[in-house]
């Protein structure tokens, strides 16, 4: 069934979000139009402001409305000598929620993928190399995803770090806490065995 052109456009617009199919988009559109128009107006206003005002931190490339994000502008963390490289701003939030890392970040906004036209320049690797060569960084922690592209990206960046004389490490991969071995895939299990630690 076709709705009014504007309702159809709203449904199609909502489908641009990851994981939102036609039915989910229709439910969202109807919820906003039927029951909570104030929330819909607030959503539209916030979305409009975010799209025009949110950019990238000049130092780490995460999302921010300022020239520097809160971590890079922090007097305590902005000068930390440990730098963690991640693929997305969501990865920063995941690590921050653990509360264990107190260094700075560098957000690639993706991973190397030559077939998709994503090379070193698209990931800001010249900016990263400048920070490593410029001094002040003693350790680089690579926290890219454990995928073929994530591994290739980590190896590429590790070479840059070594040339700059910066110690480089990669986060461990393996069996999740609370996980049962029978449900762990063979690749993860192999990584766990290869990365085992003495007790």
UniProtKB/Swiss-Prot annotation:
SUPFAM superfamilies: Recombination protein RecR (SSF111304). Keywords: DNA damage, DNA recombination, DNA repair, Metal-binding, Zinc, Zinc-finger. GO terms for biological process: DNA recombination; DNA repair. It holds the Pfam family RecR_ZnF. CDD domains: TOPRIM_recR (cd01025). Residues 81-176 form the Toprim domain. InterPro entries: DNA_Rcmb_RecR, Rcmb_RecR, Rcmb_RecR_Znf, TOPRIM_dom, TOPRIM_RecR. The keyword Iron-sulfur does not apply. A zinc finger (C4-type) spans 57-72. GO terms for molecular function: DNA binding; zinc ion binding. May play a role in DNA repair. It seems to be involved in an RecBC-independent recombinational process of DNA repair. It may act with RecF and RecO. HAMAP family: RecR (MF_00017). Belongs to the RecR family. This is Recombination protein RecR. It comes from Shewanella amazonensis (strain ATCC BAA-1098 / SB2B). The gene is recR.
């Amino acid at each position: 069934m076709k709705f009014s052109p504007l309702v159809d456009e709203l449904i199609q617009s909502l489908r641009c979000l990851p994981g939102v199919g036609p039915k989910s988009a229709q439910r969202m559109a109807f919820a906003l139009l039927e029951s909570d128009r104030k929330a819909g107006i607030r959503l539209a206003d916030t979305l409009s402001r975010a799209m025009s005002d949110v950019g990238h931190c000049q130092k780490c490339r995460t999302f921010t409305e300022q020239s520097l994000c809160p971590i890079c502008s922090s007097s305590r963390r902005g000068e930390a000598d440990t730098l963690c490289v991640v693929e997305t701003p969501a990865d920063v939030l995941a690590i921050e929620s653990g509360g264990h890392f107190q260094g700075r970040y560098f957000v690639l906004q993706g991973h190397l993928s030559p077939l998709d036209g994503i090379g070193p320049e698209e990931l800001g690797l010249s900016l990263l190399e400048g920070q490593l060569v410029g001094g002040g960084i003693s350790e680089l922690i690579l926290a890219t995803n454990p995928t073929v592209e994530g591994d290739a990206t980590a190896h590429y960046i590790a070479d840059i770090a070594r040339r700059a004389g910066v110690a480089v490490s990669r986060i461990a991969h393996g069996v999740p806490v609370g996980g049962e071995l029978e449900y762990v895939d063979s690749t993860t299990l192999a990584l766990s065995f290869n990365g085992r630690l003495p007790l």
